[in-house]
Amino acid sequence: MAILRSLLLPLGLLLCLWLLCSPASCTNSTTNCKPFLSVTTKKSSLIHISPDIYKSNTLYTVSTQVSHGIISVVLEARDQNKSVIGSWENPSDHCEGRAEYYLKGNFSTLFKAKWMSPNSTDITTVKINIYTVNSLRNAELDSITLPEVGTVTVKHVSTKQVITTPTHKPTPAPPKPTTNPQKTTTNHSIPTTSLPKPTTSLYTSHPKLTTTHKSSANRAFLCPVREAIQILFIFLIGTLLF
C-alpha cells in the first residue's frame, strides 16, 4: 500500500497540472468577454478597408480614426448569416470571435488591424463591425460591408445623350441674329429740280474761228481801199473846182 500511495501521489500531481494547463483553462484570454456598458451607432463612417471587395482566403487591412479618450478597439467580422468568421492578427484579447486591441496613450490616432478571410465559397457578403471603447466601457459602433466579387452594380452613363432635368426654368436665350441682315427701306428723295440743259449748241455758243478770221481780213482789206477812194474822190472834186 505504501508503494501504491507513493506511485499515486506523483500521478495525481501530474493530473492536476494537466488540468490546469488544458486548452479549456489555458485560454482565459479567449473566454474573458468584457461586456459593453452601452453601445451607440456613429453617425458618420470613418472606416477604410483594403481591398474593398470580399474574396476568400485574403488578408485585409482595416483602419479607422480613433478619437481622444478611446482606450481599446473591438473588431468582428460577420457573414450574411451573422456568423463570426475569419481571424484577426495579434489581438490583445479575444472572445467569441471578437478581437480587442488595447491602445497605448489617450490621444487621437489612426488605428490599423489585419483580418484574414476564411477559405470558403459560401460567403457572399461580410460586415466588419468596429467598436471604439472608452474607459467606462461605453462603445460606439461603426460598420462597413464588403460585397462579393461580381455583385457590385456599376451604372453606365450613355455617351450618346445625357438628359438633365434642372430644378429651375432657365432663362430664355436672346434670339440669334439672322444670317442675312435686313435691308433698310429708307429711300433718299431725289431732287426734282434739274439743271436746265443748254439750248445753244456748241457750234452756236462758240463761233468758228474761220468766220472771225475772214471778217478781220475783209476789214483790213477794205480800210485802205476806202481811204484810197476817198482821196481819189477829193482829188477829182478839187480838179473840177479849180
From Swiss-Prot:
UniProt GO cellular component terms: apical plasma membrane; external side of plasma membrane
Low complexity bias spans: 179-205
Cytoplasmic side: 242
Chain ranges passing through the membrane: 221-241
Glycosylation sites: 28, 81, 106
Biased composition (Pro residues): 169-178
InterPro entries, A to Z: PLET1
Keyword line: Cell membrane, Differentiation, Glycoprotein, Membrane, Signal, Transmembrane, Transmembrane helix
Protein's job: Modulates leading keratinocyte migration and cellular adhesion to matrix proteins during a wound-healing response and promotes wound repair. May play a role during trichilemmal differentiation of the hair follicle.
PANTHER family assigned to the protein according to its UniProt record, in alphabetical order: PLACENTA-EXPRESSED TRANSCRIPT 1 PROTEIN (PTHR22527:SF2)
Protein name: Placenta-expressed transcript 1 protein
Organism annotation: Bos taurus (Bovine)
Taxonomic lineage from the root: Eukaryota, Metazoa, Chordata, Craniata, Vertebrata
